[in-house]
Curated annotation (Swiss-Prot):
Signal peptide: none
Location of the active site: 99 (glycyl thioester intermediate)
Catalytic activity of the protein: S-ubiquitinyl-[E1 ubiquitin-activating enzyme]-L-cysteine + [E2 ubiquitin-conjugating enzyme]-L-cysteine = [E1 ubiquitin-activating enzyme]-L-cysteine + S-ubiquitinyl-[E2 ubiquitin-conjugating enzyme]-L-cysteine
Keywords, in A-Z order: ATP-binding, Nucleotide-binding, Transferase, Ubl conjugation pathway
CDD domains: UBCc_UBE2W
Matching Gene3D superfamilies: Ubiquitin Conjugating Enzyme
The UBC core domain, residue ranges: 15-161
Protein name per the record: Ubiquitin-conjugating enzyme 15
Protein family: Belongs to the ubiquitin-conjugating enzyme family.
Database matches in InterPro entries: Ub_conjugating_enzyme (IPR050113), UBQ-conjugat_E2_core (IPR000608), UBQ-conjugating_AS (IPR023313), UBQ-conjugating_enzyme/RWD (IPR016135)
Amino acid sequence: MTSSSAPSRKALSKIACNRLQKELSEWQLNPPTGFRHKVTDNLQKWTIDVTGAPGTLYANETYQLQVEFPEHYPMEAPQVVFVSPAPSHPHIYSNGHICLDILYDSWSPAMTVNSVCISILSMLSSSPAKQRPADNDRYVKNCKNGRSPKETRWWFHDDKV
């Protein structure tokens, strides 16, 4: 993992605002199972509670996601991190950063907050063990000063969990 230049935080474009308002309306009518959006006045930053699926290692455990939308959403992926404490998972670092390809290189404008949440719940549900990534300490140490996970050049090598 290496770093690249940090994206700047700018106000949402008109397209991003329209898309997010539509997604929020759809979410409020039919939220994905296991998720609850905490309503605020900030369309650019969502807080979402995720509860582990029944029959999994994370059953009935609730964690919090923070989703920040870039100026050009949905052409650019949102930044999605777990707020402390992050679940122990082979693809979730203790600082909340998530190693999931759809949040980075495999992002598509056809994806939605709903589809991202379902992917994260699926990732949690398929885990055979609660453990941190092998390089957790090194990665977290290198992420000081609030570095965004979008500044990391991720290596997606394990799609089993």
